[in-house]
From Swiss-Prot:
PANTHER family with a match to the protein in the record: N-(5'-PHOSPHORIBOSYL)ANTHRANILATE ISOMERASE
Listed GO biological process terms: L-tryptophan biosynthetic process
Gene3D superfamilies: 3.30.460.40, Aldolase class I (3.20.20.70)
Record's protein name: N-(5'-phosphoribosyl)anthranilate isomerase
Family recorded in the similarity comment: In the N-terminal section; belongs to the TrpF family. To B.subtilis YnaI in the C-terminal section.
Annotated spans, N-(5'-phosphoribosyl)anthranilate isomerase: 1-198
UniProt GO MF annotations: phosphoribosylanthranilate isomerase activity
EC number, as in UniProt: 5.3.1.24
Entry keyword Signal: no
EC category name: isomerase
Keywords for this protein: Amino-acid biosynthesis, Aromatic amino acid biosynthesis, Isomerase, Tryptophan biosynthesis
Catalytic activity: N-(5-phospho-beta-D-ribosyl)anthranilate = 1-(2-carboxyphenylamino)-1-deoxy-D-ribulose 5-phosphate
Amino acid sequence: MKIKICGLSTKEAVDTAVESGVTHLGFILSPSKRQVAPEKILQITNDVPKTVKKVGVFVDEPIDFVKKAIQVAQLDLVQLHGNEDMNYINQLDISVIKAIRPDQEFKEYEDVILLFDSPQAGSGQAFDWDSLVTSGLKNKFFIAGGLNPENVAAAIQHFPNAYGVDVSSGVETDGIKNLTKIKNFVQNASLASSKQLFIEFLRITKKLNENKIIPYLMGSLAVEQIINFPTNPDDIDIQLKTSDFENFEQLTSLMEKLGYQLIDLHEHKFEKASIHVGFASVETLKNYAGVDYLTIQQERMENGEKYHLPNVEQSLKIYEAAKRDEWRGGKQKDSFIFDELIKEQKRNDNE
């Protein structure tokens, strides 16, 4: 789940958002009480990891102004809140998020990330969620408008296929970003997203169990189950015994029955709406992290579904290896999770 905090204007708020685990930082570059200059954006984000995306928000600005701001602020995406059409968007050599009202026509915006917002963006007013039907929607989309730490979990539950959630005034007090609200919003969004992913993992596990396969849950979703700490997992990381990969066509057929499409044969990755599932061989853990899969003996049963889960010590070895892995992205997140695992290990040692 992507989590975006918008309307940022201070280094303190940016740092808090990044440390809390956001994926996107939003900055208003058009006239607004939250407006910030491109030069200041560059200044307050100079040490933000590349894995956290900087989004510039514009409303019907001249295209040259937007292009200049992208260059100066070193933006990763732009978010358009005006009447910009595809002719306008096609002039931008950058990923675009297009904000629209739930009752607005959006068929022309192919291959554009959508952001469903209230008619008055940044007002703190929510729109009627029931008025928006997203089943069958091919575009990735954010939900915005009136979100806050108290209702973001309900929003994620209501829109399980959402690409992300976006908040601005919902993490403010008297028009100023509230650092505690930012932390609470990110934590609540992360926990709600993880719950949705875990439910989906159990659906997949049920199918695997029916074929006499017991999967190994790995990655940040596994860590959240182990130490009960929000990690905002991006996907479902499943490992299987090599023998279970021998009939990959059967595995592909199984995933297709659950609504997934194979998007990367080499990496064994599947996709359904905003959910990504990756499969790998659990035997590779020994060379990668010094973890013999035969020692992963923690077996869990959830609603009758059976799966394996690494313990804290094994997870520490895996994330220590991930931190050294030059091919992996998300280094900051790996380090963050590693630090939390260290804390959990110390707590266990003191008990």
